[in-house]
């Protein structure tokens, strides 16, 4: 397996958009299908899934995966952290599509304080929080959430 740096991943994404050509939303859909496939081959549809998403493209990926897993019969609870009320274009498109299809077990858009759901060893957490673009230490509520997730017994799939 080749492990790429954040800069290499962004460069490959841009190369694909420039040379295939493919719209960034379609590239996100393609990546989300691959993530969904990886999850469905490893986890039964009876496990509870909790998705944490931020307003950027990692969150857009996570929301698309939420939709796709729900279409396959998985029980998904999705949480989108939209504290500042601004989403990336692709995140907004995936949020709107997720809400309009109405297949997820629950969808919550967090705009202020947040009490995380209980995570057990049966839970699969899909981490659509921050990826390779994060260039500073986490602080505040996100630092607490990541600590909570990491200290849980849940299984975790991180998206980037």
What are these regions (language model features)?
Residues 1-45:
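Positively charged, low-complexity intrinsically disordered leader regions
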């Amino acid at each position: 397996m080749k492990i790429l740096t954040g800069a290499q991943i962004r460069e490959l994404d841009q190369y694909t958009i420039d040379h295939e050509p493919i719209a960034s939303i379609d590239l996100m859909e393609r990546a989300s299908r691959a993530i969904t496939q990886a999850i469905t081959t490893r986890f039964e549809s009876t496990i509870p899934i909790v998705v944490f998403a931020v307003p950027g493209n990692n969150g857009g990926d996570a929301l698309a995966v939420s939709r796709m897993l729900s279409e396959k019969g998985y029980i998904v609870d999705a949480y989108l952290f939209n504290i500042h009320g601004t989403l990336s274009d692709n995140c907004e498109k995936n949020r709107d599509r997720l809400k309009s299809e109405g297949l997820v077990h629950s969808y919550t858009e967090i705009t202020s304080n947040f009490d995380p759901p209980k995570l057990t060893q049966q839970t699969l957490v899909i981490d659509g929080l921050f990826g390779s673009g994060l260039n500073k230490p986490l602080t505040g509520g996100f630092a607490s959430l990541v600590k909570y997730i990491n200290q849980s017994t849940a299984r975790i799939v991180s998206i980037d």
